[in-house]
Design a protein with these regions (language model features):
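Post-Walker A helix-loop "phosphate-sensing" segment adjacent to the P-loop in P-loop NTPases
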Residues: 134-144
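Residues in well-ordered beta-strands of folded domains
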Residues: 37, 118, 148
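A short glycine-rich beta-strand->turn/loop micro-motif centered on a GG-aromatic cluster
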Residues: 144-152
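C-terminal accessory "lid"/substrate-recognition subdomains
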Residues: 2-113, 138, 151-156, 160-161
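Catalytic cysteine-centered active loop of the rhodanese-like fold, especially the PTP/DSP P-loop
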Residues: 112-134
Length: 161
């Protein structure tokens, strides 16, 4: 066998990351793979989070009729969220923190980092800020990065029932 993986104690997410490291070609990074995850606090904090940030201090687009059914993937919601000075300040502070932490995690030998950003439902504010952080991190070449919006569809599914 070319590769041997002991999956007996792996979470599904960990197995996926290990397989991506082996089979995703053209990746040139130092064994650190970062997941930027948005989530809704009402569904619980992701158990595999290393860093958790709460953006519920920002105005909630849910209460704006034209934005309620949209998500942080939509430009209108992104403009609303990032149009708030506090959102820009938060992103700058988050960029500063990750610029400090990531090289230190690499030196420590950490191979997986989950940065979770949460709001109430995981649909608007957290998605917007997670996307913004992902765009910053994907510009670097010494680690891999992916985005996941864990709860983006949960309210929609619940309301259909």
């Amino acid at each position: 066998a070319t590769y041997i993986l002991d999956t007996s104690k792996m979470l599904t997410r960990e197995l996926k990351l290990e397989l991506e490291k082996i089979f995703v070609k053209g990746q040139n990074f130092c064994n650190l793979y970062i997941t930027v995850m948005s989530f809704g606090f009402k569904y619980g904090i992701p158990s595999d989070s290393d860093l958790v940030f709460d953006v519920r201090f920002l105005p909630n687009p849910y209460y704006i009729d034209g934005l309620r059914e949209k998500t942080g993937n939509d430009p209108e919601v992104q403009d609303y969220v990032m149009g708030n000075e506090k959102a820009e300040q938060f992103l700058e502070k988050l960029k500063d923190m990750t610029e400090f932490l990531i090289p230190n995690y690499i030196l420590e030998g950490k191979n997986q980092l989950v940065i979770s950003i949460g709001c109430t439902g995981g649909k608007h504010r957290s998605v917007t800020l997670a996307n913004a952080l992902y765009k910053v991190l994907e510009k670097q070449e010494n680690y891999g990065v992916r985005i996941e919006h864990r709860d983006i569809e949960k309210d929609t599914i619940t309301k259909r029932k």
